[in-house]
Amino acid sequence: MLDAFSRVVVNSDTKAAYVGGSDLQALKKFIADGNKRLDSVNAIVSNASCVVSDAVSGMICENPGLITPGGNCYTNRRMAACLRDGEIIIRYVSYALLSGDPSVLEDRCLNGLKETYIALGVPTNSNARAVDIMKASVVALINNTATLRKMPTPSGDCSALAAEAGSYFDRVNSALS
């Protein structure tokens, strides 16, 4: 896992060059947007349970067969596993947003995710839909357009951070397809 700083150092070191130019400007921007980034992550983690439960509820509303006998959310154990998986995904998205680097998400969450779901017989299309709903909720939280939220959200223009968070959810969906 690399954060924004480590990534720049590693890239410069492989080129046997000093940190400078566009890498330095990117780090300056990362630092300048630090409070917005922290506020965005705080908004995500403070609302994570609601975001995940809303996403799973939305997925089930669109596919009621998931909660009928034989469905992948039928029985409390399977529903709990579904909610747990959503919590894990959103947690790793928040880690990636905090560090400004998707490697923690890729390495610790997405690596082998599709194969695991296939082996367990979990429909990836339903998971992808839940991820889309989580993405929409998180982007709304970061952009301060969400309603009925638990706490204040980041102030100022956070569209770049919202897009970054959205890209991490897109990575999750790519890993599932």
Curated annotation (Swiss-Prot):
Membrane topology: Peripheral membrane protein
SUPFAM superfamilies with a match to the protein in the record: Globin-like
Post-translational modification: Contains two covalently linked phycoerythrobilin chromophores and one covalently linked phycourobilin chromophore.
Binding sites annotated in the UniProt record for phycourobilin: C50, C61
Keywords assigned: Antenna complex, Bile pigment, Chloroplast, Chromophore, Electron transport, Membrane, Methylation, Photosynthesis, Phycobilisome, Plastid, Thylakoid, Transport
Domain of life: Eukaryota
Record CDD domains: PE_beta-like
Annotated positions of the N4-methylasparagine modification: N72
One Pfam family in the UniProt entry: Phycobilisome
InterPro entries reported in the protein's UniProt record: Globin-like_sf (IPR009050), Phycobilisome_asu/bsu (IPR012128), Phycobilisome_asu/bsu_sf (IPR038719)
Residues that bind (2R,3E)-phycoerythrobilin 2: C158
Compartments in which it is found: Plastid, Chloroplast thylakoid membrane
Example of a GO cellular component annotation carried by this entry: chloroplast thylakoid membrane
Single GO BP term: photosynthesis
Residues the record lists as binding (2R,3E)-phycoerythrobilin 1: C82
Sequence similarity: Belongs to the phycobiliprotein family.
Task performed by this protein: Light-harvesting photosynthetic bile pigment-protein from the phycobiliprotein complex.
PANTHER family: C-PHYCOCYANIN BETA SUBUNIT, PHYCOBILISOME 32.1 KDA LINKER POLYPEPTIDE, PHYCOCYANIN-ASSOCIATED, ROD 2-RELATED
Subunit structure: Heteromer of 6 alpha, 6 beta and one gamma chain.
Protein name as annotated: B-phycoerythrin beta chain
The organism of origin for this protein: Rhodella violacea (Red alga)
Lineage: Eukaryota, Rhodophyta, Rhodellophyceae, Rhodellales, Rhodellaceae
Gene (name only): cpeB
